[in-house]
Design a protein with these regions (language model features):
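An acidic-aromatic
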Residues: 49-142
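N-terminal leader/targeting segments and the immediate start of mature chains
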Residues: 1-44, 66-68, 89-90
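Generic preference for well-ordered secondary structure
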Residues: 5-6, 21-23, 106, 113, ...
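Gly/Pro-enriched, hydrophobic low-complexity segments
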Residues: 108-222
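A structural signal for the main folded, soluble domain(s) of proteins
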Residues: 18, 22, 33-37, 52-54, ...
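A generic structural signal for short, solvent-exposed coil/turn residues
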Residues: 29-31, 44, 103-105, 152-154
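Short amphipathic alpha-helical surface micro-motifs
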Residues: 16-23, 91-95, 139-143, 176
């Protein structure tokens, strides 16, 4: 039963329901060999190109980009993609956590985490994690997913927002970022990889609004 198919009573145990959504995420299968290609970063009238490789160890290598800030940005996107494709069992990740139902709204049913991850929250709907609110390295990140890509072997987030904030005060840390991701399979039945990511970031404090596009082309398995 999915979060949207029937009302969920607040306070009930949601471990099995949350596990279904967790296991519905698309991840790379064991034995993933890695891939390489051409990377393009653009912002305004500026475009920078280079080459990249993600190895079987899921470590990213980017070459041919001299601008350190752009190099860091491209590497960061590739790292983020790889880290979210790692396949870890539900027990490996969440064995020390409990999952309790909160209220249900149009975004999904709230999942309140207890145990090791106390303070974290999720929302789930139709076996998709539609909201993530997690404490990571002294900050809080809140992600809302509004559209996904169904691969036939799990879903990938397509359209989503991300906002960082202070865990104590709730003050925002930077502007909200809106993402649109396009994925493609490397070959027939092959692993799905990122083809394009567009990030629009709102202005915050002295930091202006920005729009960055990352494209990954000529993709080939290693």
């Amino acid at each position: 039963m999915t979060a949207s198919s029937a009302p969920v009573k607040p306070g009930c145990d949601l471990r099995d329901t949350f596990q279904k959504a967790y296991e519905n995420r698309y991840t790379w299968t064991p034995g993933f060999s890695g891939y390489r290609g051409r990377c393009l970063w653009s912002q305004g009238d500026q475009t920078v190109t280079g080459t990249f490789e993600i190895g079987a160890d899921l470590k990213a290598k980017v070459e041919g980009i001299e601008d350190e800030q752009v190099l860091k940005a491209v590497h960061s996107q590739l790292w983020e993609v790889a880290i979210h494709r790692v396949r870890r069992s539900f027990e490996q990740t969440h064995s020390s956590n409990t999952f309790t139902a909160g209220e249900t709204d149009n975004i999904g049913t709230e999942v309140i985490v207890g145990g090791k991850g106390e303070g974290d929250r999720y929302r789930i709907k139709d076996d998709v994690v539609t909201m993530v609110h997690r404490h990571i390295h002294g900050t809080v990140v809140t992600i809302f997913t509004t559209a996904v890509t169904h691969t036939g072997a799990g879903y990938l987030s397509h359209t989503y927002t991300s906002q960082y904030s202070d865990p104590a005060s709730g003050d925002l840390r930077g502007g909200k970022s809106s993402f649109k991701d396009t994925f493609t399979p490397l070959n027939d039945g092959g692993p799905w990889v990122l083809k394009e990511r567009v990030i629009q970031t709102e202005a915050h404090g002295d930091a202006p609004a920005g729009l960055q596009t990352f494209r990954f082309e000529s993709l080939a398995a290693l």
